[in-house]
Amino acid sequence: MDTTVYRNRLTRMGVLSLLALAVGLATSSSPQAQSVSVKQTTESVRRALERLPYYGVFDFLAFSVDRGTVTLHGYAYRGSLQTDAEAAVKRVSGVDEVANKIEVLPASTNDDRIRWATFYNIYTDDFLSRYAPGGPMAARYEARQFARFPGMQPFGTYPIHIIVKNGRTTLMGVVDNESDKTMAGFKARDVGLVFGVDNDLIVKK
């Protein structure tokens, strides 16, 4: 994955502000060069995506702004998120056009198994459970109650997003330190029958 693009990823979580709006602004080479209107549009788009009600831990959204054009990137567990994100951004003042490049992940029973097993491994771990919004007990409850239903996922402010496609896992989001990043990768690789794990987590600075 291109490092520049990934560092412009948008994550919906409590630590989002710590990314300092690291959203790609193709019209300028530095924050100082950004116009006020572009900054305002960027903030408004970010808020619009944050408010999507069905954006969960198995999704990941990002965007870039070039004048009045917003390009959406990322992965959607359900196709409805792709269309909902585009509709929400189109309503933002200052947005003239939306290029929707969000990829809808293919339906797969095996991928679902990997998603939930990875979720359980990470968010109930003694070391990483502080990232679970409701703590490890809430994560255990969600895994036990909803994993059996196709298309279900935990919604909310989960900092570590779990993207699974064709048996391969990619971790995206923001963590506090390198130790947490390493541990999350280890927990993802510990899931049975996963073909590989890409650890693209960003360490908070």
Question: Residues of each region from the PLM?
Answer:
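N-terminal targeting leaders
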Residues: 2-19, 25-205
